[in-house]
């Protein structure tokens, strides 16, 4: 019988490999993205101090539940960019979390760029 590779295990493997190479600082935090089946989450993380500086997700009240998943991801990207600007953050290191740069992850990244984050 042919064994099918577990997609989440492969994603976690990619994520660990990338995390070994990138790290966020207070001046240039890591924009970490996590995608579940129903929601998407974004955090600005200072890896040196080990703290989350700002976060946004589809669970926030500002994000419409009636919108499509891609539209919700765009709203989260806008929200995380605004939260970062409020804390004086303009440059980040993008961590796609092992996900393919497509769909909801790309929509979040593009919206964050349009609203003032540079990466």
UniProtKB/Swiss-Prot annotation:
Annotated GO MF terms: 5S rRNA binding; structural constituent of ribosome
Pfam family, one: Ribosomal_L18p
Entry annotated with the keyword Protein biosynthesis: no
Signal among keywords: no
Cross-referenced InterPro entries: Ribosomal_uL18_bac-type, Ribosomal_uL18_bac/euk
Protein's GO biological process: translation
Keywords carried by this UniProt record: Ribonucleoprotein, Ribosomal protein, RNA-binding, rRNA-binding
GO cellular component, one term: cytosolic large ribosomal subunit
Function of the molecule: This is one of the proteins that bind and probably mediate the attachment of the 5S RNA into the large ribosomal subunit, where it forms part of the central protuberance.
Family: Belongs to the universal ribosomal protein uL18 family.
Subunit structure: Part of the 50S ribosomal subunit; part of the 5S rRNA/L5/L18/L25 subcomplex. Contacts the 5S and 23S rRNAs.
NCBIfam families: L18_bact
This protein's name: Large ribosomal subunit protein uL18
High-level lineage: Bacteria, Bacillati, Bacillota, Bacilli, Lactobacillales
Gene that specifies this protein: rplR
